[in-house]
């Protein structure tokens, strides 16, 4: 039942899949780019900031199961800091994210060949943009290909983002690489989906985006877990019911129209700053002047360590994320865990987080009027915000990372067992 798992950077959901496969004794190897041992001497001589960056790449698994392919990723991390920014240019730089993914994919494919010859693995598990060569090699040896799609499939994403570029052309500069990807990159994504036997998705929005040509594939839907910070139960009490100050609406994420910020700005324009304060925390995708021209009186908060993010959340009343395209935005569950009701679109991937009128409200994507209407509702029902916040906190706590990983591991185990039985029946005729 051994599975080779690969991902260049090993984010939270990858780590939880890895842990679940390890618990089930399904993990053959985990491949990534950079790894770091906190006890290594070389770590301690690095500058503090880079030391922290490296230690994010520590993986708590047996050393024999951990394989790294670090060189191109190290170049991507280090050289731009030395002024060589062009080496990491989108799709063009020799140390770009795309170049790192392709190089990593080829390296993993070489390892698959070695393991498959000795029948040491049954399947490979890879992620969007880093799976094509791995899957091609796996197919040569009759291995199953598991594909995790963390965000809506590219055809759906591209269609929605191009529509946004037409609807709000001034915001198109914030839409990012999704509408500028080359044909070659899109062909890679298409090839990965075609070769996949199993597709893992974090929610209904992503699974619905799977193209018709791939609807026959085995699909596993497993929602991401909610953050469980030490301050989970430090809910902000009656703050939401305080009518003597403006209602504080929080947006968190990259500051672009993919996340619906243009629609939220338009909705906020309907309210006096005396009544509603918009707090925006995230990374700039355009100069600050662009945003201030659109909405002069919003409050900007830069990114910060997680404990400070939680403190900011507890100072707000509601969380709004009217996204156009997502996979499943973790920040929604983080906000809920701190007692904030939600105003979100189904396109955030968090439709299941909304118990209407209890944990928040769903609004249609691209509808500032609907956002404004729900903010007005909260203004008129401020005494209900603490109650809804508590409901949101309780509902978010039902989603755990352990459940996320265990569901994927359990369903993969069942799928591979059934496939073994099918192959045996074919042999017996």
Named regions from a protein language model:
Residues 43-45, 76-95, 141, 145-187:
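Acceptor-binding helix/loop patch of EC 2.4 sugar-transfer enzymes
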Residues 166-233:
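Donor nucleotide-sugar binding/catalytic pocket of nucleotide-sugar-dependent glycosyltransferases
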Residues 193, 311-316:
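Short alpha-helical donor nucleotide-sugar binding micro-motif in glycosyltransferases
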Residues 226, 240-259, 265-270:
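Conserved donor-binding/catalytic core segment of Leloir-type glycosyltransferases
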Residues 288-310:
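Nucleotide-activated donor-binding/catalytic signature segment of Leloir-type glycosyltransferases, i.e.
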Residues 324:
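Aromatic "clamp/platform" in nucleotide-sugar-dependent glycosyltransferases that forms part
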Residues 356-357, 361-367, 377-382:
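Conserved acidic donor-binding segment of nucleotide-sugar-dependent glycosyltransferases
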């Amino acid at each position: 039942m051994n599975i080779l798992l690969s991902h260049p950077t090993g984010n939270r959901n990858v780590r939880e899949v890895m842990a679940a496969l390890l618990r089930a004794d399904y993990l053959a190897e985990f491949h990534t780019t950079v790894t770091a041992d906190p006890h290594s001497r070389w770590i301690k001589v690095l500058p503090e900031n880079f030391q922290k960056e490296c230690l994010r790449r520590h993986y708590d698994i047996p050393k024999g199961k951990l394989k790294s392919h670090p060189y191109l990723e190290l170049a991507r991390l280090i050289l731009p800091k030395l002024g060589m920014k062009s080496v990491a240019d989108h799709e063009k730089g020799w140390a770009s994210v795309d170049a790192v993914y392709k190089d990593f994919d080829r390296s993993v494919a070489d390892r698959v060949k070695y393991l498959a010859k000795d029948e040491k693995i049954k399947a490979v598990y890879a992620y969007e943009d880093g799976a094509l060569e791995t899957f091609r090699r796996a197919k040569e040896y009759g291995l199953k290909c598991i594909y995790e799609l963390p965000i809506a499939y590219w055809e759906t994403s591209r269609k929605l983002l191009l529509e946004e570029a037409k609807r709000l052309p001034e915001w198109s500069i914030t839409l990012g690489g999704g509408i500028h990807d080359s044909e070659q990159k899109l062909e890679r994504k298409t090839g990965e989906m075609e070769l996949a036997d199993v597709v893992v998705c974090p929610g209904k929005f992503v699974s619905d985006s799977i193209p018709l040509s791939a609807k026959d594939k085995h699909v596993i839907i497993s929602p991401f877990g909610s953050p469980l910070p030490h301050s989970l139960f430090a809910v902000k009490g009656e703050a939401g019911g305080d009518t003597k100050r403006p209602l504080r609406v929080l947006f968190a994420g990259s500051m672009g129209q993919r996340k619906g910020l243009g629609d939220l700005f338009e909705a906020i324009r309907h309210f006096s700053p005396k009544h509603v304060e918009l707090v925006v925390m995230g990374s700039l995708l355009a100069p600050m002047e662009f945003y201030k021209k659109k909405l002069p009186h919003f409050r900007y908060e830069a990114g910060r360590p997680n404990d400070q993010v939680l403190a900011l959340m507890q100072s707000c009343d509601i969380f709004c994320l009217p996204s156009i395209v997502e996979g499943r935005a973790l920040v929604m569950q983080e906000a809920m865990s701190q007692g904030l009701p939600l105003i979100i679109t189904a396109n955030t991937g968090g439709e299941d987080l909304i118990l209407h009128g209890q944990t928040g409200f769903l609004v249609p994507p691209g509808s500032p009027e609907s956002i404004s209407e729900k903010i007005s509702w909260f203004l008129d029902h401020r005494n209900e915000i603490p109650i809804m916040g508590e409901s949101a906190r309780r509902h978010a706590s039902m989603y755990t990372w352990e459940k996320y990983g265990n569901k994927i591991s359990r369903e993969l185990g069942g799928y591979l067992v059934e496939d073994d039985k099918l192959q045996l029946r074919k042999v017996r005729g």
